[in-house]
Each structure stands twice: as structure tokens, then as C-alpha cells.
């Protein structure tokens, strides 16, 4: 749908960066817990990119490789991936587990926001 713009999805590589990007963020932020070997995670990549282009002015989009930051995945009890968590002012609001089609993903995010 959107061509030319590069999506702004921040990759988180440390607990400190997580605190900067999510915990201390005012407003909505989203984190995608994923792994390179996960097929459904790879299916969600373009869905996330398009969602960021649509909702990027309302939600700060981030992603975490669970193999790189296992302790952070443990902190949020990530049992299945992809797991996508929506935060508001650093507090978890809601989460989605598994791959979701584009329209449904954007619709669910819009419904999760106030």
C-alpha cells in the first residue's frame, strides 16, 4: 500500500535501551518479540512495517530478538513468538500472540488504544 517510505521500527539490543524506548516512553509503544528462525515472525515483518507507516504517529514501534535478549523475553513471560505487546506510558496495555493479517493487526491496535 505504501511505497518509498522506510518504516521506523527500532531494534532493541539491551535492557537499558528497552527502558529508554519503552519504559520511559510517554504515549503508546509497541514491542514485537521475534526470532530469525521463526516463520510466523518473518510473516509479520511486512505487516509490522505497514502498520508503522499507518500508525507510526500514534505508536512507537520496536522489536526484540528473543535469542539476543532472552532475559527481557523472560521478564515478559514470552512463551510463543511472535508476541506483540502494546504499552502506554511504559505499562503493558495488551498483547497479541501469533501472526495476524494486515487489516486485522491494524484494527486490533486501533481498538487497543483509548
Can you annotate each of these PLM segments?
Residues 1-7:
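Short, Lys/Arg-enriched N-terminal segments with co-localized hydrophobic residues
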Residues 11-28, 70:
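A short beta-strand-turn-helix
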Residues 28-29, 82:
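Alpha/beta-hydrolase fold active-site loops
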Residues 88-114:
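Non-catalytic, surface beta->alpha helical segment in thiol-disulfide oxidoreductase systems
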Amino acid at each position: 500500500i505504501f511505497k518509498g517510505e522506510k518504516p521506523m521500527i527500532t531494534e532493541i539490543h539491551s535492557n537499558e535501551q528497552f527502558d529508554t524506548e519503552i519504559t520511559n516512553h510517554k504515549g503508546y509503544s509497541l514491542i514485537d518479540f521475534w526470532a530469525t528462525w521463526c516463520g510466523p515472525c518473518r510473516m509479520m515483518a511486512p505487516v509490522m512495517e505497514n502498520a508503522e507507516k499507518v500508525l507510526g504517529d500514534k505508536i512507537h514501534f520496536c522489536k526484540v530478538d528473543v535469542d539476543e535478549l532472552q532475559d527481557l523475553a523472560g521478564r515478559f513471560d514470552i512463551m510463543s513468538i511472535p508476541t506483540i505487546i502494546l504499552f502506554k506510558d511504559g505499562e503493558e496495555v495488551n498483547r497479541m500472540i501469533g501472526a495476524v493479517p494486515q487489516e486485522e493487526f491494524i484494527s486490533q491496535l486501533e481498538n487497543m488504544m483509548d
